[in-house]
Amino acid sequence: MYQPEFPPVPFRLGLYPVVDSVQWIERLLDAGVRTLQLRIKDRRDEEVEADVVAAIALGRRYNARLFINDYWRLAIKHQAYGVHLGQEDLQATDLSAIRAAGLRLGVSTHDDMEIDVALAERPSYIALGHVFPTQTKQMPSAPQGLEQLARHVERLADYPTVAIGGISLARAPAVIATGVGSIAVVSAITQAADWRLATAQLLEIAGVGDE
């Protein structure tokens, strides 16, 4: 059995929205979401730090699991719940500093080889993607599909896992049925005609996560 070396997270993180603003963090926390990721791109450093500080404060207020994408130094400085890194960021990041600060670590993967790389670091959870075609981010890899996702989930057994990539409200039940512990969503909420309704429906499918 694989065991994380970073601080653990619940096996089921539940619904896991990935958003790019403090405004979305606050909305979703107010709507009952308890696992989130702040992913900021193309902003000035001082703006990024201000948003990271505000998001972490909100996460604490709601007793939520807030992960900061990429900006691991700021996450350590301001004591975030956790950090999420892509494969391309692992070599350039001081993982021992993240571990020493007591932060959880999530790592993106896209195939078996990248899962091996992630497992070598023993993160808190492993993200599996992208499951379906996605417009949110340019992806060099092909979509995995449900069958491949289920195989990865089985391989990782009791390791906390997160499915990501093109997961819509309609697709969410089939993704959860693979046994994955969490579903990360972006446009399924942020581009929904009624984001509150979409969030409530996705929470009903994926839950808020284990304590």
Swiss-Prot record:
EC number(s) recorded for this UniProt protein: 2.5.1.3
Gene Ontology CC annotations of this record: cytoplasm
Please write the reaction equations for the catalytic activity of this protein: 2-[(2R,5Z)-2-carboxy-4-methylthiazol-5(2H)-ylidene]ethyl phosphate + 4-amino-2-methyl-5-(diphosphooxymethyl)pyrimidine + 2 H(+) = thiamine phosphate + CO2 + diphosphate; 2-(2-carboxy-4-methylthiazol-5-yl)ethyl phosphate + 4-amino-2-methyl-5-(diphosphooxymethyl)pyrimidine + 2 H(+) = thiamine phosphate + CO2 + diphosphate; 4-methyl-5-(2-phosphooxyethyl)-thiazole + 4-amino-2-methyl-5-(diphosphooxymethyl)pyrimidine + H(+) = thiamine phosphate + diphosphate
Cofactor(s) annotated in UniProt: Mg(2+)
Its annotated pathway? Cofactor biosynthesis; thiamine diphosphate biosynthesis; thiamine phosphate from 4-amino-2-methyl-5-diphosphomethylpyrimidine and 4-methyl-5-(2-phosphoethyl)-thiazole: step 1/1
**How is the cofactor bound, as the UniProt entry phrases it?**
Binds 1 Mg(2+) ion per subunit.
| Residues binding 2-[(2R,5Z)-2-carboxy-4-methylthiazol-5(2H)-ylidene]ethyl phosphate | 134-136, 166, 186-187
Asked if the record carries the keyword Signal, the reply is no
Q: Where does 4-amino-2-methyl-5-(diphosphooxymethyl)pyrimidine bind?
A: 37-41, 69, 108, 137
Tell me the enzyme class: transferase
User: What keywords appear on the UniProt entry?
Assistant: Magnesium, Metal-binding, Thiamine biosynthesis, Transferase
Q: Which SUPFAM superfamilies match?
A: Thiamin phosphate synthase (SSF51391)
Top-level taxonomic group: Bacteria
Q: Which HAMAP family match?
A: TMP_synthase
Free-text function comment from the UniProt entry: Condenses 4-methyl-5-(beta-hydroxyethyl)thiazole monophosphate (THZ-P) and 2-methyl-4-amino-5-hydroxymethyl pyrimidine pyrophosphate (HMP-PP) to form thiamine monophosphate (TMP).
Q: What family is reported?
A: Belongs to the thiamine-phosphate synthase family.
Q: What is this protein called?
A: Thiamine-phosphate synthase
* Organism ancestry: Bacteria, Pseudomonadati, Pseudomonadota, Gammaproteobacteria, Enterobacterales
